[in-house]
Amino acid sequence: MDETSPPLRRVWAYLQLLRPPNIITALADVLAGLAVAGTSLSLSGGTVPVEPFAIGALLAATVGLYGGGVVLNDVFDAPLDADERPERPIPSGRASRTGAALFGGLLLAGGIGGAALASTTSALVAVFVAAGAVLYDAYAKHHVVFGPVVMGLCRGGNLLLGVSAVPALLRPNGYLALLPLAFVGAITSISQGEVHGGSRRTGLLALLLIGGVLGSLFALGLRANYRLLHAAPFVLLFAVQVVPPFVRAARTPAPERIQSAVQAGVVALIPLNAALAAGFAGWIYGSLVLALLPVSFGLSRLFDVT
């Protein structure tokens, strides 16, 4: 990038606000939700036909919803970042707080609009996710319990956004939102020590939640339409990727170890979603979802995850 070009620097600053590696994980949420709904994507073995336009609308919607949420997070955090993270786009002056607020609001509105193109049910799910994102950014993230719960509900809602491609299947599969809720709750709770360090108690809580997620992924094998044999390799990959850094952070809750755990946890949302996708739609479809992992890793070399 040409650092002598102010317009390009400004564009780059707004891209940084979007946290592109994280947006890739949001796409994985929706793709997993589509698998849960049994939609007839190519290679998925799905039984419920869904228009490709609706699938594209839901994928675009999650980009808007997640992107809007993380941009507004920086807007609300601007005064704090001026002290703790002055290199971020807003406190450094590379992006204006007003411009970022407008950008984030437009992204959320676009996300809701995109979901509405799929179905009214999808639009309602998108409104829930958008409201949760704003609630988290403005208030909940400062609460030790409320913050992780709200963020987890947003992620769970994002999974259900994919399920809503078949509205009739949303209610019977709604409990699956507990998986991302628990895992993101683990990430969010431990992330509260990113700057000043955390506590072993928080680290142990995060490990307990991760253990519950792993156990639940295997317990889903009790469902007739969930093929545990297909999901198991992805569950193992998820465990290998996320457990070691969280154990290290729990043992020594220093800022750098917590940051490493959070980064690993965010990216591990992809193998988590791949496990769900493989269980409900077969290992080939699960592998397609997992293919987002190197994309997210590559983008994480260019953009911050947290």
Which residues does each PLM region occupy?
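Acidic (Asp/Glu-rich) catalytic motifs at the cytosolic membrane interface
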Residues: 61-92, 97-99, 186-200, 299-304
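Short, amphipathic, aromatic/basic-enriched membrane-interface segments that mark the entry/exit
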Residues: 16-21, 90-100, 117-122, 143-146, ...
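N-terminal, positively charged, Ser/Thr/Ala/Gly-biased leader segments
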Residues: 1-32
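C-terminal membrane-associated helical module and adjoining short loops/tails
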Residues: 2-10, 156-159, 164-306
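Multi-pass membrane catalytic core of lipid/isoprenoid biosynthesis enzymes
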Residues: 57-62, 78-133, 148-154, 158-160, ...
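Membrane-embedded alpha-helical segments that form the functional core of polytopic membrane enzymes
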Residues: 26-76, 84-85, 108-116, 120-136, ...
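Divalent metal-coordination and catalytic microenvironments
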Residues: 18, 77, 274
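Transmembrane helix-loop junction
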Residues: 34, 38, 74, 92, ...
